[in-house]
């Protein structure tokens, strides 16, 4: 394998680790960095990603098996970047290459509008033009930046709340699909808030130090 390819794989492995590694109740740093650039609440971007591709540690271990001895298994459920959804069925893979190879086969059998890819499950039919290639669609940071861009656009269309923007992210036409999706995102947000409050109490013992996740009203 060429030296450049090895370097690329190493950098990508570091990126995935950044997106998975955090305290049990923290939002991983990678999501915070991307969200800040786009003016999206980090908790919203993370909750959307959880809704799209969440995997429990045991499920991640099952996918990875013994393919990467250096991979650090997260202690809690995290979004998984090597995910494809085809016609409503999800597929998880151990590496970017495996996911990309599977996608090439799916694209010969299904229209792009029936395929979602990556850590934030961006639909290739509606938003594939936002990627330079199908390979790029599996880069976790490119996927998250794309998702944050779409969320920002949805927020402008739905200025009442970020929850409505999340529903738009899943189903721009609204209706029952958006409502169901929003309910799942809300559950993730509420859990994140509870966990953050619990952590603050354990570390500080001060209710005044509780983090305030602003995901219903606009963030000033």
PLM feature spans:
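Catalytic glycan-binding domains that act on GlcNAc-containing polysaccharides
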Residues: 23-195
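N-terminal secretory targeting signals
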Residues: 1-43, 183, 187-220
């Amino acid at each position: 394998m060429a030296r450049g390819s090895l370097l690329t794989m190493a950098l990508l492995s570091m990126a995935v680790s950044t997106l998975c590694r955090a305290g049990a109740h923290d939002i991983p740093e990678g999501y915070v960095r991307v969200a800040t650039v786009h003016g999206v609440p980090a908790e919203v971007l993370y909750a959307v990603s959880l809704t799209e591709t969440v995997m429990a540690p045991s499920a991640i271990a099952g996918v990875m098996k013994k393919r990467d001895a250096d991979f650090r298994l997260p202690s809690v459920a995290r979004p998984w970047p090597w995910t494809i959804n085809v016609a409503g069925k999800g597929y998880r893979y151990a590496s970017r290459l495996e996911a990309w190879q599977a996608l090439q086969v799916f694209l010969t059998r299904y229209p792009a509008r029936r395929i979602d890819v990556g850590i934030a499950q961006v639909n290739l039919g509606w938003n594939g033009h936002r990627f330079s290639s199908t390979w790029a669609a599996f880069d976790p940071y490119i996927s998250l930046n794309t998702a944050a861009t779409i969320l920002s656009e949805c927020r402008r269309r739905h200025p009442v709340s970020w929850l409505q923007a999340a529903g738009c992210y899943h189903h721009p036409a609204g209706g029952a699909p958006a409502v169901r999706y929003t309910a799942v995102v809300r559950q993730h947000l509420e859990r994140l808030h509870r966990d953050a409050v619990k952590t603050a109490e354990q570390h500080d013992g001060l209710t005044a130090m509780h983090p305030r996740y602003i995901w219903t009203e606009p963030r000033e």
